[in-house]
Design a protein with these regions (language model features):
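Ribonuclease/tRNase effector modules and their secretory precursors
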Residues: 1-94
Length: 94
């Protein structure tokens, strides 16, 4: 079954300006079998649980993608190049 992604187009454009990462590229980390996902309690609410997934994009960039589950789709909220600490954690766990 293929994963379905959705996002706000205005946020997607703003994300490219701010973080130099497109949501199209960000969506490719979910195909990385070595990616890891953690719950983000600080940015979650009773109405929406948020998660951060760290993984390698199709371009080989290690990205951190904030997202939530919308039933049949993954809604991407933001994406950026992973921090040094996040990259180290990703590399050590694989």
């Amino acid at each position: 079954m293929a994963l379905i992604f959705e996002w706000d187009n205005r946020k997607a454009k703003k994300n490219i300006v701010n973080h130099k990462v497109s949501f199209d590229e960000a969506s490719t980390i979910f195909a990385d079998l070595l990616s890891s996902t953690i719950y983000d309690p600080l940015h979650s609410s009773p109405d929406e649980e948020r998660f951060v997934t760290i993984g390698s994009s199709y371009r080989g960039k290690i990205l951190a993608v904030v997202h939530c589950d919308r039933g049949d789709a993954i809604r991407i909220i933001s994406a950026r190049v992973a921090t040094r600490k996040e990259r180290k954690t990703y590399e050590e766990s694989n």
